[in-house]
């Protein structure tokens, strides 16, 4: 079994396409801004891994030298590493929450509105021509908590969540 599994996530020779500051329209007329990182696969369609958060999608994070993950110009705090994921056939979509980073509006962290915005961003992404229609979410801490909230709304295109180090019980974990 292990011999078969070792080749599952091996990188391919995809080139990386980077789209910065892409506008995502929301149901209430507001917009969010996202950075999209995707494999250059011609007509091939890819699933997307998304996150939303207030930590500025453009803010570069450099990991310590002793981590397996190596620095690259596309890393951001507690989000998916697009260099790693895109090489394996996934797109990464990093969204600034309303009122944070480049997204205009009033910031309301951990709110129902943020979950609705994430729902809209997921469904918008699923309809893009390069997307297979399948969306997963990934992130650590705050980005993990956002996944629980949007999953509760059951966006049709959301197929998986990967919440790392987030709260499982908001009341118990925060009070």
List PLM regions with ranges.
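N-terminal cap/lid segment of alpha/beta-hydrolase-fold proteins
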Residues: 5-44, 48
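Short coil/loop residues immediately preceding or within conserved phosphate-binding loops
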Residues: 19-21, 132, 145
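Loop/turn elements at helix/coil->beta-strand transitions in domains of secreted/extracellular proteins
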Residues: 31, 45-48, 88-91, 131-134, ...
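N-terminal cap/lid subdomain of alpha/beta-hydrolase-fold enzymes
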Residues: 35-90, 95-98, 109, 152
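A catalytic-pocket lid/entrance helix-loop region that shapes and gates access to the active site
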Residues: 70-73, 113, 138, 145-175
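Alpha/beta-hydrolase active-site loop
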Residues: 76-77, 109-129
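Alpha/beta-hydrolase fold nucleophile elbow
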Residues: 129-142
């Amino acid at each position: 079994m292990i011999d078969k599994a070792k080749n599952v996530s091996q990188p391919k020779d995809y080139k990386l396409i980077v789209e910065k500051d892409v506008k995502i329209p929301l149901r209430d007329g507001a917009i969010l801004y996202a950075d999209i990182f995707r494999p250059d696969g011609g007509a091939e369609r890819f699933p997307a891994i998304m996150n939303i958060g207030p930590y500025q999608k453009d803010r570069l994070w450099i990991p310590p030298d002793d981590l397996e993950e190596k620095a690259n110009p596309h890393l951001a705090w507690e989000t998916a590493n697009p260099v790693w994921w895109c090489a394996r056939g996934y797109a990464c979509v990093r969204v600034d929450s309303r009122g944070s980073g480049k997204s205009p509006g009033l910031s309301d962290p951990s709110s129902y509105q943020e979950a609705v915005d994430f729902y809209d961003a997921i469904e918008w992404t699923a309809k893009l021509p390069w997307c297979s229609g399948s969306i997963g979410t990934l992130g650590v801490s705050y980005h993990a908590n956002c996944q629980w909230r949007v999953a509760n709304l059951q966006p049709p295109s959301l197929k998986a969540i990967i919440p790392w180090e987030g709260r499982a019980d908001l009341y118990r974990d925060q009070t």
